[in-house]
Structures are given as C-alpha cells and as structure tokens.
Amino acid sequence: MEAHFVAAAAHSAAFGDRVGGESPYLSHIVLSERCMVNFGVPTFLLASGNNFYAEVQIRFHGCLQCTQWRRVFSVYAPSSAIDRILLPDVSSGNCGRSAPFRIMYDSGNSWGGLFISVPVFCDPEKLTFDGYTAVAVRLAICGSADEFYEMLFTYDELAQPQTRFYADAGRFDALALQICEYHIPAAWPSRRKEEFLNLRGRLLELIAARGSTRQLDKVLRADSYITHEQPLVPDPPKEDEAASEAKKKEADDAMKKLKDAAAKVASSDANRQREPGDREQGVSAALLSTCSGMPGDHHAPQHAAVAGAVKAVASGLNSIVRGLSAAGGAAATSASQLADIRYTDALLAGLEPPGRNRGEPRPQRRVPDLESVVMDDGQSRHDRVIPASGLGGARAPASVEECLKALCAIISDPGTPPQSAWTFGPISIVTHSCYNSGSPILIVTYSDGGRRAYPPIVSGITALSEALLAAGASFPSDLNEDEKAELLRKAPCFARPMAADEAREYQKLFSVDSEQVFLFGLQARVTTAMITALTVAVARATDQAADNLLLNQIVSYDLAVRDDDDLPGGRGQRDRLAVAQYDGDRAAGHWPAKLASQAADLIAWFCVNLQTESFATFARSGVWKAILTSLVAEDTLHRLPFLAPFHSDPAIYMFDYFRFGAGNMSRVTGDPNVIRFKPALRTGLMDCEFISGAASPAHPWAVHKFLPGQFHSYLCVGLNSELEGLLIFPGGFGLRFDLGETLDEVWDKNLDRAVLDRYSRLANISGGPPRADRGADCAIADVGCAYPYLKSAPRAPSDFSTTSTSGHESVTILY
C-alpha cells in the first residue's frame, strides 16, 4: 500500500482530481510472484535485500508511439502480499511480538508480489481507454547496468472499472475481534495501558451491538479477496463454490430488506383509495418488487425514464435496495435497465459496475484528503487518542472503525508515521489473469474518505464488442462508415487505431498481443539479416573448386598440435601456421581440419538457434545491442541505450557465446561479453582483451574466463557499432561478415523511432541543461501526437521522490 499511496500523492499534486486527456487515471496493481517468474524475473533477488527500481512505459495501440521511460515507486513483498493492503502496520510498536492482525491463507494464495501504480490514459469526453494499449514494466536489480528484466501487459489486464468492495464488508469486524485478544505488553506505561483498555471496552460494546444483527467472524480469509489461484478456465465454477461468506451474509440481509420493502408497498397500496384498475397496478408493483428483486415505487410502474438518469445496478441485492432507496423521487428504474447487456458480464463475475453516470462521465475523487495525512505535525500519537470515558469528557468513538484506528495508534510507537487513511476505508481487490502466463494480477481500488470510490474510466472494448456484434462483423475494418462513426462516438479512444494505415504493416491491431507481434517482427528482421550475412560470408570463404570452407585465423593464439611434421611448412613455421588456411584435404588428421569440415554444420546450428530464441533472450544479446548502438549513433538526438553496453569505438565488439557438442548448440551468455581488439605482433592477426566491468552482483559466479576462440567448444559471435561481425571458432579461426549491409535490405527506416523510444532514453533526462519543453517531465509529454486529445504537455509537477532504507523498496521519481 505504501507504493500506491505515495504514487497517488504525487499524482494528485501533479494533476489534481482531473481524469481524462492529459491527466491519466492511476491504476494500483500487484503483480504476483508467479507472474514475474514467468517473465523471467528472479524474484529471489528482489527478496534478498538487493536494491532495485522499476520503470514504466506506455506503448500506444495503433501508432507505434510510446511515452518516455519513467521510474515509479515500487515495493516487493516476498510473501502474503495482501497483508500490505488489508492489515494496519503496527509492527514497530509491538515490542517484538507477533502482529495482532492476521489473514488466513492457503497454499495457493500466500504468494508475494510487486506493488506499482500505472497511469491509464483515456479520452476526456467519455473517459474510455484503449484496452489494447501495452504497458511495459522494467525491473533493474542490484544496481547493475545489465541486470534488467522487462514485462509486457495491456491496459485490459491492469485497468478495470469493476470493483469488489462488497468482499471487504467483514474486514473491520474481524480486525476488531482480533485486536480485542491483544495482550498488553508489560513495558507499557500505565497511561498507555489505561487508554488502550478504555478504548477496547468501547470497542467491545460496539461489537456487541453489531453482533446482535449479524454473525461476526474474527477469521479474515484471503480467498475472499484472491478469487482464483490458477489460470482462468472457460467453465465458471459452481455458485456454491465461488460464493464467499461475506456475499452469503449480504444476501441474507438483502432478502430481509426486500421483504420489508415489499410489505410496505403492499400496505401502502391497500390503504390508498384508488380505482379498481389502479389497485390492480399497485398489486402488480408489489409482486414485481417481491419476485424480481426490484422494488417499485408506491405508484404504478412507469416505463418512460428521465433521460440521463443514473442506472442503479449493483452486484448484490443489498446494493440494489440501497441504490433504489437513495433515488427517492427520481424516475423509476425499468427492468430493461437492470438487464442491460453491458453489465451482464460484471454481474455474473461478482463485480460491481462502474460507479458513475453512463450518460455523462463525472470524474470522482479517488484518493482521500492527502494533505491531512502527508502534512502530519509529528505530534505524539497518544496525545491524539480519544479515550472512551473519563479523561476530559471527550467524545467516545462512535464506530468500530474509529475505535480500531485509535487502538492501532496506541499500539504503534510514538513518532512513527500515522496509519494510512486507506487502511481504514473500504478496499476493493479484483483478481485478473496475465494473458502471457495465466498468473494472477491484483487491481486495487481504495476508498475516498471512507466512501467507496468507483473508477470513473470505461473500457472501450465493451463498445467495440457491441458494435461488432450488432453489425455481425469480426474485425473493426469490416464496419461501414456509419458504424465506425458510432463506435468512435461511444469510444473515442479508438480514433488512432481505426485510422492506422502505417502501423498496420508492423502491428496486429485490436489484438492483446499487438506489441508482442511488433517485437517479434523486429527479431525476425534481424534474424533474417544475420542469416543472410553469414550465408554471404560462407559463400565468399568457400573454395569453389574443392567445395571446401576455408577458415583463416583471426585471433592470435599458439596452437598445440601433436605432429609438427604434418603441418603446412613443417616444424618451426608457427607464424605461417597461424595464418594458414585449412580444408578437408590438407593436414586431415589435425583438429583445425576437422573444425573446418564441421564449420558449415556449426553455422547452420547457430542459425537455427537464432530463429528459435525467445524475444527476451534476443533482446539481451550482443546482436540486438549492437544494432541499438548503431541506431543511437545515427540519431540526431543524444541518446543512450537502456541499460545496455554502449561503445561507439569500432574496435570494441559485443560477443555472444554458444556451446556446441552432442549434436546440439545452446547459448552460454545472457548478456554479451564486451571485448576490445587490437593488432597483434603477428602480421594480419588480432589480439583481444575483456573490457567488461566486474561480474554482476546478481550473479557473482559469472566470471569471464575465456576470450573468443580460447575454449574448445565455444562458437563466438561479435558485432561492433558499425555492425561489422566476427564469427570465431576454437583456436581463433573464423569468418568476417557485414550485418549492416544485409540489414539495410530488410529494415525499414520508419522503425528507427519506435525502436529508439522503446530501448533508449534521451541523454539529458537525468541531469544536464533542461530542455525547452521541460514540462515533458510528466509521463505523457511525448505522446501529444499519439492521440487527438493529448495536444500539449501538462504543467510539470515538482519532483516527488522518496528514499527508503528497506532493501525491498526503491528510490523513485513518479509521474
């Protein structure tokens, strides 16, 4: 919760309560440990006290444009992630005891997770967001420039307007019962003990009064919040298995209220003097109230609703009663409104619909009064406690929540930060599945000053699905002009992808894997160019007459050969040996000749390996980083590759190592070895040396041992900033190839900007003279051309940063 609270504070300082256009909505999420592991993140490094930080980039759907990388506040909980959300933190003042609050977990939902907040851009008119827009999250671990991991999500995974506040109904009762069992430490002073006992007595009175109307349970269960632990399956679970205890209690209370409401309507109609026809309509209204769960008013049902009336639809019967009762004299809600197809999925899934008027979006405050919490005067906690009786005649706490907050303040040490206001308000936790792994992702919505704060945003995918269903089309391009115009009226967020002609060549539009397809396309282009370059090099080095591949020694090494008499030139001719050419006919008994006969097969294995690698592996390779270095060198702006070795010297190569043997080949290096070449004493040969830094703190065992050609079963591939390549076999033999020449044939210059925005940063973002558009410090400054409603950069907020001494938290600069 700390990460979410600080992110909301900075966001509120920058944008206030505005939502839409240049002011993004902030979605608070928790990425489960299993989700991060499936993306290749070593979570054990996050939990072992290593420093790390997180960065976020928004990649807009249909235009290949994206925001700048921005560091966000992040906290990692190694286990029991929802403890950080639902339970007050009183560990500092608990005198080494176990915490008074606890949640019951099972083996499937006790996982940890990463707490971050993501900006969600939506149009200012309808507040719709494009669910296909991608969100890239990068984690840099151990402060190492090369130790980073990237995760890709979509807005549809990380931002949802539905909530589950109802599942939090019994949390305060459970926490109150748990704190009543707290044993007072003997070291407490008498005044502190007295205040605690007085407040606990008052709390017991309030609990007793509340328990007279419903059954209270002191067990807080994680499965009430985390609704699934495994990937979602097509068949929904049975209702008796999916329903939680809180929902059952709510249904019982709601049924009682429904019966009371129906009886009141029937009694009123019976006592009212009416004509016979009107009396029949009154009886019908009462029957409708009792049978359908929709209480009517005291008059005959009216089917004409006032335009713009709020649709009082909710997930529970209790919510329906409260919503319709609050309407008072407003127009009656018709049955068709309750059966609105756009809410069906949310209701069946146990979610609450968007809490706003669907006709005219009204942004709501989503965070509490941050000033009263952030601008704390540091006064002792115990001086602010209101005792239950005696002591100055102060007003006793009137609710369980007030008592609970005061008791937590007493347990905490004096001078510690105050409890977050979010902890003592309703909290919604919605579980979604990651598209790539099926692992759970939590979307958290906090209350607004104790009131439920429903997200004002709406997913444009809902309007898109309705338009396609009504037209009988399977793709947005199949819609006619009128249907497209109606879709854009309901969901302006699709204005750019609907008109995307240029991006259609590189992206799979209106697809959850749109960004992945774009990245795979980049990998395919580079792989094709690499294979072509190697094919050209092999063709040039092949003796057409003898049909043998001739390998020259490139790196200067002394070769140990058993029989010098069989060597070309005889004994004492090692300099000539070093530059000699070997084929299958000359010196057939020596390993250089055997290597020459196997070289073509090894190159073929290497090409197959390139084609089958994942993009995550490819993005860390020396081949891709050399291409980035080349693009950065050609760009007019001063840029640095993101967390990649950057060397513009053409004598410096980034090498990937592949080990061969037993009929296969596998990559050895994760990040490339950076090696400098220089002329050797022997004419025509090269010497080389490592210039990489020390081994990564994350992997201290990864010590550089072998230069290219030193190990008997390593095939080494290196590229410099000019995309000149070296393919080095054991012994220093190899081929030279030109990747830049073949890459130009398959690379589109329109891709340069998209690649640089994703894999580099402007050199003067951190330090240096400020740019003229310093307002671009906001995350959305560079997306003015991405959507019509982002026309200019917003005002720049003051830098909001915080430093934490915990190894699980990061120093941050927020949106």
Swiss-Prot record:
<dbReference type="Pfam" id="PF04559">
    <property type="entry name" value="Herpes_UL17"/>
</dbReference>
<feature type="compositionally biased region" description="Basic and acidic residues">
    <location>
        <begin position="236"/>
        <end position="262"/>
    </location>
</feature>
<dbReference type="GO" id="GO:0019028">
    <property type="term" value="C:viral capsid"/>
</dbReference>
<comment type="similarity">
    <text>Belongs to the herpesviridae CVC1 protein family.</text>
</comment>
<feature type="compositionally biased region" description="Basic and acidic residues">
    <location>
        <begin position="271"/>
        <end position="280"/>
    </location>
</feature>
<dbReference type="GO" id="GO:0051276">
    <property type="term" value="P:chromosome organization"/>
</dbReference>
<comment type="function">
    <text>Capsid vertex-specific component that plays a role during viral DNA encapsidation, assuring correct genome cleavage and presumably stabilizing capsids that contain full-length viral genomes.</text>
</comment>
<protein>
    <recommendedName>
        <fullName>Capsid vertex component 1</fullName>
    </recommendedName>
</protein>
<comment type="subunit">
    <text>Interacts (via C-terminus) with capsid vertex component 2/CVC2.</text>
</comment>
<keyword id="KW-1048">Host nucleus</keyword>
<dbReference type="GO" id="GO:0042025">
    <property type="term" value="C:host cell nucleus"/>
</dbReference>
<keyword id="KW-0426">Late protein</keyword>
<keyword id="KW-0946">Virion</keyword>
<feature type="region of interest" description="Disordered">
    <location>
        <begin position="227"/>
        <end position="280"/>
    </location>
</feature>
<feature type="region of interest" description="Disordered">
    <location>
        <begin position="795"/>
        <end position="815"/>
    </location>
</feature>
<keyword id="KW-0167">Capsid protein</keyword>
<keyword id="KW-0231">Viral genome packaging</keyword>
<feature type="compositionally biased region" description="Polar residues">
    <location>
        <begin position="799"/>
        <end position="809"/>
    </location>
</feature>
<keyword id="KW-1188">Viral release from host cell</keyword>
<dbReference type="InterPro" id="IPR007640">
    <property type="entry name" value="UL17-like"/>
</dbReference>
